[in-house]
Each structure stands twice: as structure tokens, then as C-alpha cells.
Swiss-Prot record:
It catalyses: a 1,2-diacyl-sn-glycero-3-phosphocholine + H2O = a 2-acyl-sn-glycero-3-phosphocholine + a fatty acid + H(+); 1,2-di-(9Z-octadecenoyl)-sn-glycero-3-phosphoethanolamine + 2 H2O = sn-glycero-3-phosphoethanolamine + 2 (9Z)-octadecenoate + 2 H(+). This is cGAMP-activated phospholipase. Its EC number is 3.1.1.32. NCBIfam families: CBASS_lipase. GO terms for biological process: defense response to virus; lipid catabolic process. Induction: Part of a CBASS operon consisting of capV-dncV-cap2-cap3. InterPro entries: Acyl_Trfase/lysoPLipase, PNPLA_dom. It comes from Escherichia coli (strain TW11681). Phospholipase activity is specifically activated upon 3',3'-cGAMP binding, which is produced by the cognate cyclic nucleotide synthase encoded in the same operon.
Length: 356
């Protein structure tokens, strides 16, 4: 796909998709546009982004998209579904209605989210059915610990193989305030959004390669290449005027009935994970192996492009930004092209024994 020497070809390729609610439209638009570019270059090939990566990891909406890609869906298919269904997941409501509802219940019903996920990954598909390695973070509310849903790419992995993907997808996207915790019957546990612990899963993706993929890949840091796609939300912070109001620092005003608290938590740990990744790569002289694609939304637009704004204007803006960034980067950035030299080898392990 590119006149690049074999030396430049990545040995292990990781796709990492950040969380961000409705802003995931930006993420999937980037991936879908790259597919279109590759399809134009290779009209006789069935181009699917997921086929080019040895590990796909994602959080929240990024986790849903990661699972969709791992099932063999194209990014273009997922883009179409999300654009059509996002308005059902995040229906427009007056802010006063949201405010009142958040006092005693989640703002949004999880049913449209489940229906959308079923369209993307199927209702019965399990981790054992996948031929692409995946890792999806979530928070196990029943134990108070993070949990990572995975394909059985480590021979000792047995817990998640028979687990349905829809449970992992609903678990990683159950953002507090917005959606109710997801109960996974097979694990007998309640889950909340993975963005509370790893909104950018790139660093844990790198560690996964060295720890639980080592039976397939005996590699060093310089052999692992990470493509990380953001959701235009990395620079969020509370306004100085809001923070300076000493009498209005409670849950309702300062934290916006939980919305600002969730966003602050996700943004802070996103920075933390990215910085840990960069320090780790720098230590091993492998900084050039990491490519981060994202944008910072201008101030006026930022107030409109939020986690739960799925209006036509917001989705169209996010889609346009994603497509533009994909075209510019693919034309100018050889590092991006190197991820798509050739498909990765499919993964399949069937000799897993039952072990908790």
C-alpha cells in the first residue's frame, strides 16, 4: 500500500480509541475516512480498519467502536450506524429537565444504547468469536476495582471467552449521571464507564502486548506501534469564574449535577495515562512509535460539542473535523500510512480450558 521498506513495517500494531460519548463521531469519522482512502487506492480489496491491528483497545464509545471493528464491521458501517442512532442515545432535552432527573435517576435510558450496540456488534457475539485481540476497560462497582474485558489471547485467559460482547460494551459505556450501572449476569457484578480509570487506553494497551500477548509476540518497545484516536476533549477544565464562587461549590452548581465531575475525572486520567505512556516510550527511545490524532475544539464550539450533544449540527461538525484530519494526516504523515502497509495476522485460540 506504500513504497516503504520492510524495516519501517510495524511488528505489533495497536489501535487505541479514547472515550467521549457523542464525540465518538469524530473518532469513527477519522477511521471511516482512512478506509475510504485505502479503498480508493485498492478498489479490489475489502478494506476494514480492524484488520490492520494486532490489538484493538477502546474505552466507553471507543470500546463500543473497538468491539465493532473486532467483529469484522468496517469503520464506514459503524460510522453510518452511529450517525443515525446517536440522537436516540442522547435525545435533546431542556437542561432543567436533565437537572431534575439527575437528582434521582440517570439522565438517559440505556435501551437505545443497547439497541445501537446490538446493531454494531450483534446481541449474541462472544469474545471467543473474535479473530482480533481486544481489551476493554470498565469499573467493577461490585468490587471497587477496574476490570479489563479481553479476548483469550493469553492461553490462561478463560473468564471472558464465552462472555457476550454486548455486556462489555454496556459496561465500558455506563457513564455515571448519564446512564445506569450495567449489570452483567455472567459475572454477577455491576459496572460503570471505563473512562473513570482509563479514558485513554493506550498505555494499558502497550502493557498488554508485553504481558499477555508475549506468547504471540516476543517484542521490545521499539517493535510496538500505537495509533491513538481522541475525541476532541483533552483540554477540558472548569472555568475560573465557576471555581471562585465559594458559596456554590456543591454537587448541583460546581459539578453540574455530576456532568462536570465525570468529565473532569475522565480528562484528568486521560492526561495521566498519556503522560505515563510517553514517559515509558521515551525511556526506551520509542517515542516515534506513538501517533495521536485529535483536535482541540475552539472555545465557542466547545460549549456546544459535549459528551451528550447528538444534534445534527454537532454530529456533522464532528464528522467534518474527523474527515478533514484523516485526509490531511494521511497525505502528509508517513507514520500513519505505515499502519496500513498490510493486514495483521488474524488471531484465533480455541484450546482454552476453564479457569477462573
Amino acid at each position: 500500500m506504500s513504497d516503504v521498506s520492510a524495516v519501517d513495517k510495524p511488528r505489533v500494531r495497536v489501535l487505541s480509541l479514547n472515550g467521549g460519548g457523542a464525540r465518538g463521531m469524530f473518532t469513527i469519522s477519522i477511521l471511516a475516512e482512512i478506509e475510504r482512502i485505502l479503498a480508493r487506492k485498492h478498489p479490489h480489496q475489502d478494506i476494514k480498519i480492524g484488520d490492520y491491528f494486532d490489538l484493538i483497545t477502546g474505552t466507553s464509545i471507543g470500546g463500543i467502536l473497538a468491539l465493532g471493528l473486532a467483529t469484522g464491521k468496517s469503520a464506514r458501517e459503524l460510522e453510518s450506524v452511529f450517525f443515525d442512532k446517536a440522537k436516540d442515545i442522547f435525545p435533546t432535552r431542556w437542561s432543567l429537565v436533565n437537572l431534575c432527573k439527575a437528582l434521582c435517576a440517570p439522565i438517559y435510558n440505556s435501551s437505545p444504547l443497547r439497541e445501537t450496540i446490538e446493531m454494531m456488534i450483534g446481541a449474541e457475539t462472544t469474545f471467543n468469536d473474535l479473530t482480533r485481540r481486544v481489551m476493554i476497560p470498565a469499573v467493577n462497582l461490585s468490587t471497587g476495582k477496574p476490570l479489563f474485558f479481553k479476548t483469550p489471547h493469553n492461553p490462561d485467559f478463560t473468564r471472558d471467552g464465552p462472555l457476550k460482547l454486548i455486556d462489555a460494551a454496556l459496561a465500558t459505556s455506563a457513564a455515571p449521571t448519564y446512564f445506569a450501572p450495567h449489570y452483567c449476569k455472567d459475572l454477577r457484578s455491576y459496572f460503570a464507564d471505563g473512562g473513570l480509570v482509563a479514558n485513554n487506553p493506550s498505555y494499558i494497551g502497550l502493557l498488554e502486548v508485553f504481558r499477555d500477548m508475549k506468547s504471540d509476540f516476543d517484542v521490545s518497545h521499539k517493535d510496538v506501534y500505537i495509533l491513538n484516536i481522541g475525541t476532541v476533549g483533552e483540554d477540558y477544565s472548569l472555568s475560573p469564574s465557576l471555581l471562585s464562587k465559594k458559596r456554590w461549590t456543591g454537587y448541583c452548581h460546581l459539578w453540574g449535577m455530576g456532568k462536570r465531575l465525570v468529565l473532569t475525572t475522565m480528562t484528568a486520567n486521560q492526561h495521566l495515562h498519556k503522560n505515563m505512556l510517553l514517559r515509558e516510550l521515551a525511556l526506551h527511545d520509542a517515542l516515534d512509535n506513538y501517533l495521536y490524532l485529535d483536535e482541540v475544539i475552539p472555545n465557542e464550539a466547545a460549549s456546544d460539542i459535549t459528551l451528550d450533544n447528538a444534534s445534527d449540527s454537532s454530529l456533522q461538525n464532528l464528522s467534518a473535523r474527523g474527515k478533514q484530519l484523516a485526509n490531511v494526516q494521511f497525505a502528509q504523515n508517513q507514520k500513519l500510512k505505515n499502519f496500513f502497509i498490510s493486514p495483521a495476522k488474524p488471531f484465533k485460540r480455541t484450546d482454552v480450558q476453564e479457569k477462573l
